[in-house]
């Protein structure tokens, strides 16, 4: 059909909607294909010939991998051929949001190019050095390497942690991986600090992988130990609250290594937030606390000469005084400087907001990105087409039936809510702690569900038994949320701890996390203290446990459910 006066042919609608044909990309040996895919778009990548890997995990030949909201790189040691094509858009944000237009690059990527200068050989040398340390540690009967990765924001710390973990699992190792960065979740939601034993490969499409779910999974699920921090930066409140949770996590990791010979031999890989690599405030004190608590043996510094110089001055060739096996063998700390990859890009606030929302949505609903790995399995009704979906449950509860604690530390731009009169160390003489706890909570007799929420491990120590308290003072920054329910509860998360609803504040802080629930709506005029509409990963009654409000972080997530 011709348009009047222009004599231009108009393409049929079907032709305009047809996606472009896939493109083949040939990578020479020792190079990598770097690509960025926006949230809402998908890019499909298939390895046609040769060998390739994504952050240390090898790609399978003729297997299609689908990526969305990703900034990554596929590296080849010996050369390979990739097929790259655009996939179907996936929904992001509230229902009815406009689809995101595809990018100008191959496969709808926002940016994509081939890079021949990469630090992968350098990273591989680090892996082989760690393997040598593991062999030596096994022969000497001591712990394997405890690796701390430091660097500024967007320097490639998490990518290096994935590479070292992927290479270790490929060698049959079972390293413990610790995430100390609250800005992103590892097998959990943002705001959580986690530790996980990796016994199998890392999921290429999902990053680290997924936590337990009801239903099949193409990649074996991981069992994370989760503690909730609930603040955006580790230096909020001078870092004392953050250090207390780090100590608790270190106790759990040390206990696991003492009981698990495979984990002890493989060692620990620790990813850290970028803010402590920028030399701000109490960052050096936080680094020293991590080094001491985890008995760090190797410090890897990426992308900062200043930080490397400081670490060499403070730690290089210094004895590991806190480790009994290190003291017996005179083991010393090594500080290594690594090259920052040219593929590292800055992630702006908008992108990180999408990352957090995507992790929270995936926790409750599964991944909306189609996966051929999932479709290759005989999946149950929990899958729609080739998309792995989960089925969370909604319920309504009275606000007064829950024991909810709010974090009082002020973040940047907020006024401090800290009130010393709420804590035991400031109570008048003769005032008992049990009386204080009783006055803080008003709970009904609810029974926890028989199933476990994602992130819960039944063998974890309870909040009141097992490990000693990590705190050295009783000034824990929590306050009980009074009735009636504030409207600001809507669209936020609650972290369900393994602490009793009338536990002390230190016990609430030191308790591991059973799982998370989402508050979809608050009706302050109904029920006792208000009515809350909740979204939970499993059905049944809400567990009768103390809960921590994630108002400050990860903050408000609007439109998770209608």
From Swiss-Prot:
Biased composition (Low complexity): 445-479
Residues that coordinate or bind ATP: 32, 71, 154-159
InterPro entries tied to this protein: Clp1, Clp1/Grc3, Clp1_C, Clp1_C_sf, Clp1_N, Clp1_N_sf, CLP1_P, P-loop_NTPase
Gene3D superfamilies linked: Clp1, DNA binding domain, P-loop containing nucleotide triphosphate hydrolases, Pre-mRNA cleavage complex subunit Clp1, C-terminal domain
Claim: S-adenosyl-L-methionine is one of the keywords in the record: no
Cellular compartments per GO CC: mRNA cleavage factor complex
Alphabetical keyword list: ATP-binding, mRNA processing, Nucleotide-binding, Nucleus
Name of a matching Pfam family: CLP1_N
Domain of life (superkingdom): Eukaryota
Region (Disordered): 1-27, 415-483
Main location: nucleus
SUPFAM superfamilies xrefs: P-loop containing nucleoside triphosphate hydrolases
One MF annotation (Gene Ontology) recorded for this entry: polynucleotide 5'-hydroxyl-kinase activity
Any one Gene Ontology BP term: mRNA 3'-end processing
Subcellular location per the Swiss-Prot or TrEMBL entry: Nucleus
Subunit structure: Component of a pre-mRNA cleavage factor complex. Interacts directly with PCF11.
Annotated family: Belongs to the Clp1 family. Clp1 subfamily.
Described function: Required for endonucleolytic cleavage during polyadenylation-dependent pre-mRNA 3'-end formation.
UniProt protein name: mRNA cleavage and polyadenylation factor CLP1
